Amino acid sequence: PQPPTADALRSLPTDLIYGLPFQTSDSFARTLDRVNAVGPDRMSVFNYAHLPKTFKPQRRIDESQLPEPKEKLKILQMTAEKLSEAGYVYIGMDHFARPDDELAVAQREGTLYRNFQGYSTHSNCDLVGMGMTSIGSVGNCYAQNVRELDTYYEVIDKGQLPVFRGIKLNHDDEIRRGVITQLICHFELAFASIERQWNVDFRDYFEPEMAQLHNMVNDGLLEINDQGIYVTPGGQLLIRNICMVFDVYLKQHSGQRFSKVI
């Protein structure tokens, strides 16, 4: 890196989006080659979320020009291969990092954490949302600010908090958050750790979920034994799908999901 960058920043990240109109695995490979030449410390490769009902500019996009799920999965697989060859470590959930980046170090040391903003080396920190649409998290509560800029300024000018909705996690929410966090950060989960922390029998508590996971075992995405759940290398690219099994709210809000997995 250039000296000013090295002095001011600990890590230089880059975000890429796949699933855009006319993208193919070949065109995205060329993009990756150009980005790799720059050599960012971290790379996030996100699936494009096409939500024209929510975002008006997206209504200009012809949906027939978007790549099919099969092509997007091909792009994702190719991305993982090329970045691995370039020396990046797969952190999980679309994230890659250099081996000496603090995220990769935290992953090796078992201290990696993920909140709703992404992967972090700081676990269980309170977050204060600043600006419109931002989300804050304090303890077991989440709150989101208003989405419209004019409304945001209007509420601020009144000396009020611009929060328009929030949620307080119940006991089941916290257990599920712990399960998802372990899987999404470490690609494995020890039944005993959840049982000690929450005083539950894991396989009894999550009996329906365990039945779904066994289908993923048959697909080669997971291994399950008496001690816990282990995500295979092939399953790591689809860790979001695996964690979705434990999301009790997913079916309730299936029509409002923010982006397709593939």
Language model regions located:
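Intrinsically disordered or highly flexible coil/loop and linker segments, enriched in small
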Residues: 162, 188-189, 222, 252-255
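Short amphipathic alpha-helical interaction segments
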Residues: 202-217
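A short, conserved structural fragment
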Residues: 217-227
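C-terminal scaffold of the Radical SAM
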Residues: 1-203, 261-262
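Minor-groove-contacting beta-hairpin "wing" of winged helix-turn-helix DNA-binding domains
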Residues: 228-232
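Short, amphipathic alpha-helical interaction segments positioned at domain boundaries
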Residues: 236-262
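Residues at alpha-helix caps and immediate loop-helix transition turns in enzyme cores, especially N-
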Residues: 27-28, 205-208, 242
